Amino acid sequence: MKIAVTYDNGKIFQHFGKSQYMKIYETDENGEIQKVHIESMGKHSHHGIAGYIKEMGVETVICGGLGQGAVDSLEKAGITIYAGNSGNADMAVIKYLKGELIKNSDANCDHHHE
């Protein structure tokens, strides 16, 4: 399984669509982390990120806030969303793998895109 975390300097970046990096965790069938790397989102932003990480095989996203457009794109791509998180990215993934990370359905950000 692959898990993507919006990432900035060791922490969960708080705006999915503006995240410049995703930290990608690859686990084995026992839920043990096997590989970790940081992927630049480069030219991808907002709705484009969902398709890009889907192509990488990501199944779950851990992030801070995200807009409804990103939610729709991720859900359409079949990616599970764990929003409303903050703090250390590695610790969030460990909590997720232990079944301790809680989904927050109220973590959508309401803003206008230019």
Predicted regions and their residues:
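N-terminal first-folded block
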Residues: 2-41
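Compact, glycine-rich, soluble single-domain proteins
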Residues: 34-56
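Histidine-centered active-site/metal-ligand motif
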Residues: 15, 44-46, 111-113
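Short acidic active-site motifs
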Residues: 11, 48-49, 91-92
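Short secondary-structure boundary segments
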Residues: 7, 64-65, 85-86
